């Protein structure tokens, strides 16, 4: 059973001003070798450092980066530029054809998009003529998965957990009922664009959420991945050119090959099943 925790806007840097260096983040630190920029492999842990630029000029963006993660295709090169925040027509078609969610459902796997959404948000995005969904949520709908409202028994808040450890443990318990579970955390990128002190709080909450997830001690393999940098440099409001972390922890971690790009993840996940 694989659990894909996507963290929007988490890059890597050696700058000592970064919250990745300033804050006490023991769980994230353990999963990433202290936010290292050097890959490592340990029992039950594979850590890789991924290029988010994809050979295309400009700052990496969410829609193209997430599409690359989910399809294994270089979405930015396909377009000739990076695209964000929401996937437009060409990327929508790619997600409909090749995303992990669509592929997994077609193979008969049990798949869950675990994010819980406010009812008013669901009404807005599902009633819009334009796509207002992220690549992860768009791919979920393309696969026929429901976008769950907050309060649904299988829905998980993507951030802002009142009790992060308990939320992480609950997420693990839900995920053990599925072959492939997705959760999209967008809080770091959101606050990273706003020069907000909330960013530190959200990083600590994410660390505690992961601690609760791992302490559940279930036979799950966690995949933690990001699409582009942002939160690691909170002294400005833009995305960064920095590489991003990929951490795989659990029974399947020993099967992770060398990976260097966002496009390397989806093909490996498909080979697992």
Segments predicted by a language model, with ranges:
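Catalytic cores of processing enzymes, dominated by hydrolases/peptidases
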Residues: 138, 143-154, 217-251
């Amino acid at each position: 059973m694989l659990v894909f925790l996507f963290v929007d806007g988490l890059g890597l840097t050696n700058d000592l001003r970064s919250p990745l260096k300033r804050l006490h983040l023991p769980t994230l630190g353990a999963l990433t070798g202290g936010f290292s920029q050097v890959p490592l492999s340990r029992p039950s842990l594979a850590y890789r450092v991924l290029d988010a630029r994809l050979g295309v000029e400009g700052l990496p963006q969410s829609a193209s980066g997430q599409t690359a993660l989910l399809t294994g295709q270089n979405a930015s090169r396909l377009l000739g530029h990076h695209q964000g925040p929401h996937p437009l027509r060409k990327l929508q078609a790619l997600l409909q054809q090749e995303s992990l969610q669509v592929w997994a459902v077609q193979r008969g796997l049990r798949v869950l998009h675990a994010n819980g959404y406010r009812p008013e948000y669901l009404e807005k995005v599902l009633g819009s003529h334009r796509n207002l969904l992220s690549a992860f949520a768009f791919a979920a709908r393309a696969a026929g998965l429901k976008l769950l409202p907050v309060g649904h028994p299988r829905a998980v808040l993507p951030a802002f957990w009142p009790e992060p450890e308990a939320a992480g443990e609950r997420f693990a318990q839900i995920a053990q009922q599925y072959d492939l579970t997705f959760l999209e955390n967008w809080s770091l990128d959101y606050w990273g664009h706003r020069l907000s002190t909330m960013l530190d709080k959200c990083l600590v909450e994410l660390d505690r959420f992961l601690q609760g997830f791992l302490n559940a001690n279930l036979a799950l393999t966690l995949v933690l991945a990001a699409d582009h940098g942002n939160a690691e440099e909170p002294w400005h409001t833009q995305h960064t050119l920095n590489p991003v972390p990929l951490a795989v922890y659990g029974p399947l971690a020993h099967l992770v090959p060398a990976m260097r790009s966002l496009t390397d993840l989806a093909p490996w996940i498909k080979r697992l099943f």
